[in-house]
Swiss-Prot record:
This is Large ribosomal subunit protein bL19. NCBIfam families: rplS_bact (TIGR01024). Gene3D superfamilies: 2.30.30.790. It holds the Pfam family Ribosomal_L19. The lineage of its organism: Bacteria, Pseudomonadati, Pseudomonadota, Gammaproteobacteria, Chromatiales. PANTHER family: LARGE RIBOSOMAL SUBUNIT PROTEIN BL19M (PTHR15680:SF9), RIBOSOMAL PROTEIN L19 (PTHR15680). The gene is rplS. The keyword Ribosomal protein applies. One of its GO terms (molecular function) is structural constituent of ribosome. It comes from Thioalkalivibrio sulfidiphilus (strain HL-EbGR7). GO terms for cellular component: cytosolic large ribosomal subunit.
């Protein structure tokens, strides 16, 4: 990759992102534009995947809403993402937790990681 592209990406990656891994429960504050006003919408769920590619980094958050599984992919350095807050650290042994899609109820719970607390 050329030096110019690396420099431009470094300038755009100025946001401080908290350290989180798959299995962690996060609250993502997303900027939503409704008409002429803008508000923040919270999306809370478990991180099931993380993609580290510099400026193109992304992570997938899964939550259960009214008995239906909802997944949303967020670009880590997107201007639409206002804030990422880690609520709970999870202890898992996989990098991609896609198997949670097939689990329901108590089986889909993730053990809390007390060491990283």
């Amino acid at each position: 990759m050329s030096k110019i592209i690396q420099q431009l990406e470094a300038e755009q990656m100025n946001r401080e992102v908290p350290d989180f891994t798959p299995g962690d429960t996060v609250v993502v504050q997303v900027k939503v534009k409704e008409g002429n006003r803008e508000r923040l919408q919270a999306f809370e769920g478990v991180v099931i995947a993380k993609r580290n590619r510099g400026l193109n980094s992304a992570f997938t958050v899964r939550k259960i809403s009214h008995g239906e599984g909802v997944e949303r992919v967020f670009q880590t350095y997107s201007p639409a993402v206002a804030e990422i807050q880690v609520k709970r650290r999870g202890s898992v042994r996989r990098a991609k937790l896609y198997y949670l899609r097939d689990l329901t109820g108590k089986a889909a719970r993730i053990k809390e990681d007390i060491k990283r607390g």
